[in-house]
Amino acid sequence: MDSENCSITENSSSHLERGQKDHGTSIHFEKHHEGSIQVSIPWAVLIVVLITSLIIALIALNVGKYNCPGLYEKLESSDHHVATCKNEWISYKRTCYFFSTTTKSWALAQRSCSEDAATLAVIDSEKDMTFLKRYSGELEHWIGLKNEANQTWKWANGKEFNSWFNLTGSGRCVSVNHKNVTAVDCEANFHWVCSKPSR
């Protein structure tokens, strides 16, 4: 019996010398190698699953771009347009607008706009009109609508006015403020609004 006890003691001591710690009935191995990282198995599995999921998601997104190129091109071209307007110009719906701080006659205001490769504002929709009224405030601003010698009303870009908004007054040039769109004398001195497409 003594020889059995001796062999167990020798085995136990030789295992303890190699890094084992005896904690009662369970034995826990702790091997420390220089430069190694110890990660428990559940954490290792979680990391592998996350990396795999990320790779699958990236592959799925790239495959979607090739299977539905029209959808991605449409989103990229329409949603990511950044208007480039000069300083002091305001960007709205792919158009640059300039609201003057001085006053001039309609003809001189149109000339000032031309110097910036623009015209007095041409308004195509109710939304554009709401935008101009809001920014004009209480001050009268020239826009690019004029009646040449009692003929048809035309915009500064040459298009005919189709009477889509109510125009009051008896003048031949049109101004706008936050409430009204009015035909007034072209020689009056008002602020003005220039417009041109954004780049």
Swiss-Prot record:
Keyword set includes Membrane: yes
GO CC list: cell surface; external side of plasma membrane; protein-containing complex
Glycosylation sites: 150, 166, 180
Regions crossing the membrane: 41-61
SS bond list: 85-96, 113-194, 173-186
Annotated GO biological process: cellular response to xenobiotic stimulus; negative regulation of T cell migration; negative regulation of T-helper 17 cell lineage commitment
Extracellular side, ranges: 62-199
Induction entry: By the activation of T-lymphocytes.
Disruption-associated phenotype: Deletion mice develop an exacerbated form of autoimmune disease due to an enhanced inflammatory response associated with Th17 lymphocytes.
SUPFAM superfamilies with a match to the protein in the record: C-type lectin-like
Biased composition (Polar residues): 1-14
Domain C-type lectin: 92-195
Cytoplasmic side: 1-40
InterPro entries membership: C-type_lectin-like, C-type_lectin-like/link_sf, C-type_lectin/matrix_domain, CTDL_fold, NKR-like_CTLD
Tissue: Expressed on the surface of activated T-cells, B-cells, natural killer cells, neutrophils and platelets. Present also in eosinophils.
Compartments reported by the entry: Cell membrane
GO molecular function: carbohydrate binding; identical protein binding; molecular sequestering activity; transmembrane signaling receptor activity
Subunit field text: Homodimer; disulfide-linked. Interacts with S100A8 and S100A9. Interacts with galactin-1/LGALS1. Interacts with S1PR1; this interaction mediates S1PR1 degradation. Interacts with JAK3 and STAT5.
Designated name of the protein: Early activation antigen CD69
Taxonomic source organism: Mus musculus
Organism ancestry: Eukaryota, Metazoa, Chordata, Craniata, Vertebrata
